[in-house]
């Protein structure tokens, strides 16, 4: 039940309007209308008294006749359809009266009903009664426009806009189009400017509403009013006060707010609670359910969704009212209705879009071709389309439906309008096309590929005779297009990298270049000079915009992570300027969210490898096509070899048929060739056509549209013959034979030429054509009707190639790189427009255009790629860098216009930015060097304002692009250096050469002429007059050095120009920012910067006559600026600076070197202020240049300066010095070896102070520092100037040892030994090859880091040739070891033995080298004797002492070092092995000393090591007499005897000299062999004696096992000696040498006897020592060994005694010249010498017990019997034998008996 207040709402709106209609109506004409109005008023009054029931209450009770109507009172009461018709009827009729005073209140009433929401429902003429009623209502309002009354136009617009904006009244379909068309007609037909503007604004607002709702899929989306001021055209802005704009804005705003005013109060009264919840509870009682999932969303989203559900409920109510029933499944119906809404909203948008496209294509009738109203309509439609596209949302951009509409309708509109001569239409067409490129390119790849050349490139490439306005429009739009950085990259990727597409980007750049360069000289042009200048400027702006766009895209990509999928970065959002405003409709949200921009059209993102492959493929294919268009055969061959075309004729034919860019004439020439391949290709080409079902002329048209028939008759004959064969094969029933088709084909071609050649005056008639072809069908005529129809078709439609349509385009823009000719389509338009049949053939043109689109889509790669990989930019730069460089360089060099200059400089900046980011060194350097040359700093006489601007650009480049310049920094810094040079020149400051030039150069400079001092400079003061001329004429940029050389003679006018130009430099500002800003560079850039600065500085300093230190001082500055960088980066920086300072520090120019070292000192002092943690090496790296310069510099002053600098740094920053100690000690180490005495004394003085006062600092952090300290002291010990310094250095080494022992040092427990450095002996570096001591305990031994370097240094000094130094070093070293060895652990002792002690004896241990012996034998005797004397002195003095001390150390610390016994024994054995009797004796004595001192220390295992060492020594020291038995000895002896004879015969013969030399060499070898044998024999005697001595000392401690090892060793010695003694040949040869050998005969008899004697003693003792209780097997072994040795001895004696006759016979054959010894006496002496051994042997056998003796008697008795028969040299043997027979053998024999 409604209240009276609610009931009166409708009547308050309707009643006054009806009363006014009644008042204004004429009773005679409009009596019916008046009566209807009164009836409605009465009905409303009656309804007010008895209101109709609400729809909710009457649903079940009402009959079908009382259907609810579209009218309601704004509350819950709804009027029936009949009541609604009753109320609407007078309003509709009033609108049809044609009287403004009647229409106006009716329209006003309708508008209020709509605005207040009293009308709800959908207006649709094809719908039900309710929809039809609403359509009639809206239609009546639209028809009011036909009245032509200006007063009615605004109410109509107001009503229609209210209807569209209404939420309750839904305008769709035809009704919507009717509304749009009405507003459109009002704009065109109204004569009131305000009404026109209002109509246009209303149209735009309607479009905003329709498309905004479509984007949101809801009719309830809030819509903001448009901003009218942004839509005003220049003509419409004639009202300066803006009243019209304000009026229209108020008109639109009020209508939009009226709807909100109706909705908001109702909504705010709902249960939602919040005023901001707009539509939240408007009609929620009938729609929103309690389980609504939108509770999870925020309030705004809920408001939107609730309003949408309310809208759905209205549809539901309408359907319920129409059908009178409810269905189950309400949720499903909701979904269906939502889809229906979406479909309707999209359908509305599509309808409006299509309608606008059609309106934009509407051509004026012929008779009114210049109709301004028609043009205004076209312009308005294009403007509306432009606005729609520029504000397109996500749905519009991605919907397939809209994409299809764009292709089908908008593209045709563009095709028609882009050729318009009216600039506004062309401008709008361009704007629409740019919007398509910016927002829709993903789905319009083929279309853009056609339109871009047609609209843009056609205009850009026309340089000589363009339409100025048209070209300026295109250039400005290109400039705006570049605002979106993604567009150009996508264009390049999808077209320039597409084989079947034109090189759009490349052609665009080249066209802009040609435009920027202007019309070529001598070419006719229609441009005026100001126009040409403006066009050049705009073209350069476009080029700059392109480069900027590329750089912006690159910046964006590098900041984003690499992704293989599309993301929001792919959004296309571009502002095309003030002419295309962003409307305040909320669509910016959709534009900003580009996640679906390419969701449907794009197939993926770009891949670097695929891009590279496609680009390379296209370039190579273009090269092949270009070659084909010059030489077809070679072109085909190239393409086949490149793999672009297959080798088969079929593949070649397919290429000729389908490829774009091929010259049609040359295709025909190639097909007509008679070569085998070309002929096969022609056959394959013709066979590829399918002529089935085609008329003959149609087949010829199809065949000939791909190429031009060649001019040669034979070629034509071959081609047409094959065509006739193919046609007859496809159509066998048309002609009797192929001959008929062949002849007819020729006739058709001739007819075509005759009919369409304007030069032919007398045209061929049909009868003539028929007559000419009689009897061609196998003697018969072809049917006349067939021939006549053929004639008609040929004469009406010319047979032509596709190329004919493009001929004009190709003439204008011949370009071999252009792959696609589709841009020539525009020429079709132009030609048709110029002709009279434009309108008649437009349909054909559109059809042809569609075919081209399809062909383009078929040929091109269908996938649209969104560029994401930055590698694409590399190819873009390669394609455009050269044109860009030319476009900017020429104007910059020639123009003085600052605008042009700044544009060019900006282009340079962006080009350098892009090339630097892409690391394209060559391209970047091309731009940078060009820009640097334009500064003209190398030629200051030519400096102008443009050069100053270039200098500023250089500075800006350094500031903004510094992170990417890499080695291009060199050019930047070169300019900075030259600028500063000129700046100082302008101030009159003296050049650096005044202070730093070398003396020689100064003297030469004084001789130079003085004509540089000119009157014009004298006003500037004496400084400037003196130095200004040095910077005048420098030559070219490349040839000029930064140091500069003397210039040529300077004229006065040049100098005047220089002075004025130098004043220009004041504009540039402070250059120091380049260096102060270096701290902002990234880690890689600062390194490049430093490298470049060092290189520039080197160039400055290289000049001997005019050196400069500007960059050198800046190096110090930037080092200060960047010293706070992380150490990793600073280390890389210093690596560059270090090499630089080393080079400068070693400069021949002493002043510069001193300056460099002082600069380095400043940096080092600054750096040492920073603390350094342990184990870092930065300080050492920083100070390394001092070390290198100290070593390399030849200047005493520099070396002294370095010493003082280093001492100052270290002593003043001693608390912070850590790793810097290393470099410091290396400097002083180098100084210790200096050739100048003062440097040595100065450096030692400083070292003395450091060690005395700061010694704890040396060892507190770095482990190797102490090593360097020791090396330094060792170096001073080796100095050659002062023995006092040497001894003091050794004393400091002792001091260091004392400090170590006292434990005053901070032990770096966390450090690890890093090995020796400096001059530690190489042996110490190789001593630990096994690697054992590097692991385990050593790492944790703190003493190792300090003791080892100290001891290694002392060890090195033991080699010093000066005895004082050598003795002191050994004394200190061993005193240190003795006194502090108890502090050492085993690992440290191992290191000490291996790397300190053993290296002292390295020469001894490693000198057993046969090659060394041979070399020494070959040398002269005199020199060798002197060396050996010195050598022996060192051996006796040093080795004896050192070896004894080593043994004593080992014994003293045996408890710790016992694992080293084996190594010590090997050292002693190495001495014994030495083929030097004295050294071997030293080794044996040390061995015995070791054994004697080690009383009771050795275990069984250690004793085994000892006896094994003795065995090894015995084995390796056996005397070698093999030389005397060799063939070499025999041969040399014979040659020596021959030489002696010859020398006796011919005293002066030349051969005597040769013989003497041979004799000398023989004697040398002989002497060496004898000496070696004697030495080894003596050593072995000493060795067996030492063994006996050791045995006697430790017999109780030696086990049988160890004793047997000794027996084995001595037995080997005895056997070897006996072998020598029993060799009669050897003995005879030794005897032949006479007293030379000084050896008895036999030579080793004593050694043999003593060896056997000791063996018998050892074995007897083993047998006798029963206390040891050896095992039975071991005892048997000992007895067996004893018996065997006894047998050996007896056998040897018996053999010796019985060999007299053999020796006598050999002696008789001896040479009479040889020395003879009576054998008898010698034999007796030998036997006498062997007698004691025989006696001992017999006695040893007697010591066997009875059982053993009896067991072995069988083998011994024969020897005893033979012994009786021997001749003895002594009676001792006989006595001992008698005793044995009597005491031992006799009892056994008697027992056997």
From Swiss-Prot:
**Could you tell me the keywords of this UniProt record?**
Acetylation, Cytoplasm, Guanine-nucleotide releasing factor, Membrane, Phosphoprotein, Protein transport, Transport
The superkingdom listed in its UniProt entry is: Eukaryota
Bias-annotated ranges (Polar residues)? 284-294, 594-605, 1311-1327
Q: What topology in the membrane does the UniProt record assign?
A: Peripheral membrane protein
Any one Gene Ontology MF annotation carried by this entry is: guanyl-nucleotide exchange factor activity
* Compositional bias segments (type: Low complexity): 55-66
Region spans: Disordered:
45-71, 266-299, 579-606, 1311-1333
Q: Does the keyword Cytoplasm apply?
A: yes
Q: How is its activity regulated?
A: Inhibited by brefeldin A.
Q: Which residues carry this modification: N-acetylalanine?
A: 2
Report biased composition (Gly residues) as residue ranges: 270-281
Residue numbers carrying Phosphoserine: 595
Name the GO cellular-component terms.
cytosol; membrane
The subcellular localization recorded is: Cytoplasm, Cytosol; Membrane
What's the short name of a Pfam family annotated to this entry?
Sec7-like_HUS
Q: What does this protein do?
A: Activates the ARF proteins by exchanging bound GDP for free GTP. Plays a role in vesicular protein sorting.
Q: What is the annotated quaternary arrangement, including any partners?
A: Homodimer.
Q: What is this protein called?
A: Brefeldin A-inhibited guanine nucleotide-exchange protein 2
Question: What gene codes for this chain?
Answer: BIG2
